[in-house]
Amino acid sequence: NNSEIVKEEQAAHDEWLRWRKEFLAEQELPTEYSQLSDSQKTSVKAIYEMIMYLQDKYGIEFEYTGYVRPQILEDEYLTAIPKGGNEKTDTVTVTRQDDGTLTDDYPNVVVRPFYEQMITDYIEDYFGSDQFKVYATVSSSTMQSIIDNSESIKVNDIGTSTVIFIDNDICSKHEINQLTNSCLLYTSPSPRDSTSS
């Protein structure tokens, strides 16, 4: 029905106008779109497109934290955090590929706390102590990692960099080396996981 299409288009346009005015005010830019340079207009449109991509894909609100226009040796990308998130641990990057498609790393952000908790539980069981802290950066994961949630996540489905701070009182250097080897075995795929069917 044409009237429904027109209503949807009007609603989308109204949302764009509302978002744009709010965004420009937050960035301390002129809220009158006509006062922006062509470059600023292009960037604002791209930022809106990327934020809406995230919100439509994941069904939650995201807050803008940064944007880089395409350059000779760098892809165009946006950084954002889930509303109320922590910029240090929850930053999501949306990248525009050469063919114009958008990709993101939100699954890595979602999986990180589950992964950190798995490693924390493992070390607590290993030493019988909670005198340590685990920090992880997840560089790759799958949507299946999110769908499966913390109950059934497979550590080897995730690419991470993990740092563990341990109180000197709970272990010796030798025990730390043993823990390192044990963690490597725990987080590495077993031979049966890597066989193809």
Predicted features and spans:
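Exposed beta-strand-loop-beta-strand "reactive/processing" segments of non-cytosolic proteins
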Residues: D56-R96
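Short helix-loop boundary/capping segments
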Residues: D148-S182
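Second-shell loop/turn segments in exported
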Residues: Q35-K41, P107-V109, F165-K173
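Short, non-transmembrane alpha-helical segments in secretory-pathway proteins
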Residues: W19-T65, Y115-E124
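Conserved small/polar residues in nucleotide/adenosyl-binding loops
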Residues: Y186-D193
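Surface-exposed beta-loop interaction hotspot
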Residues: D104-T160
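Gram-positive cell-envelope targeting signals
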Residues: N1-L17
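A short, surface-exposed beta-strand/turn
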Residues: K88-V111
